Amino acid sequence: MSSLDCKNPNHGKPIKNDPWHIYTDGSKQGDLCGAGLVVYLRGKLWQGECHGYHLQPENSVPQAECYGAKQAALFITKNQRRMHGAVSIFTDSQTTLMALNNYYIKSELVSETSDLLDRAAGGINTTTVTLRWIKAHAGHEGNEKADECAKLGATRVQLTKNATILCSPPNRQTVYAAVGQACERPGVRTSGSPVSAD
């Protein structure tokens, strides 16, 4: 079962009951665009899993943020046999949360990410996958590391021995097209008020 949580009542504090926390982020500085993710198990960085993904200069910050969530879903799908228990995916992008919660998805990237999240939640060992909002630059270690990975991915700097630098970006699609629609996806939990784009 997957769910989306657009408003975290704890102001972005990590959920301690979920053993797996995956933090994602996107970055764009001039023509440098990237996404990043880091994986934690019970509060500790898991096996050096820090990934940065290089995107094309024409990609936007919302695309990079959504691409980070897509890579988190792919990571869960690829590692289902090793991952037991609930997984929280944290993003500081309310735009991504709103786009993924929209029933009428117009962006190919958002649609692919949504499908992958559903597939990740239907895995062998994963009980639930929840995409949650976390406040940016508020001192959360995982969020700060994901931000660093996104910036390093944008510049194609090697992150760690396990790092991934992706040179083929998603198709240029706009996440904004999926934001602001009134309909919600059936079976997906959301909370919170409408938000503006990041």
Predicted segment positions?
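RNase H-like nuclease fold core
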Residues: S2, C6-R81, G85, L100-N101
